[in-house]
Amino acid sequence: MLSLHCEAQNCGWSRVDHLVSYDASGIWNPSVYRGLVAGLTVAQVGGAFWEGSETRFGKTMWQGIDSELIAGASAEVGKRIFTRARPNEGNNPCLWFQGGSHYSFPSGEASVAAGLVAPYMIEYGSDHPATYALLLLPLYVGAGRVKNQAHWQTDVLAGWAVGGLSGWASHRLDTPLMIQLLPHGVAVGIKKQF
């Protein structure tokens, strides 16, 4: 039985994925990093409505909203397709297509965190290299998800890729998707209406 268990974990992913000691204390408490991402999201939405989409910064904020929504939705679709077991659901990174409530791949929270910062890095990175420090947010969220034994390392890597690609796709649009969907007046920020 032991040889069967070891053989089952000898898939390609198992060379990257490994169980990390559980830690949900202090900064690794999920409510801490979820609160940080939620706070930044609220600030981004408020800033986007205030600024509008006619300025460089305003347009980037609207692209960030698009990117977060696309990243979250894409990750959710991936979870439903791959139904990978989480580390705390058997400690085997090779358990794919398990059905039921196994939604480990890709990490939705890592996707959203990467999607939140990607448009800003793409827009401002060449002008202001310090913008790349925003990568600390998805790095922090991803590390938290692994330390909470909620995701394997490759779940987080895939989540970062989904978020980054969502940011890239959102940044390529001349008019952000949310601006296309909302009434035309939203393009002009609240600050210009006063």
PLM region spans:
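Outer-membrane beta-barrel proteins
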Residues: A48-G52, Y124, W168, R172-L177, ...
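Outer-envelope beta-barrel architecture signal
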Residues: H128-P129, T175-L177, V186
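Outer-membrane beta-barrel "beta-signal"
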Residues: P183-F194
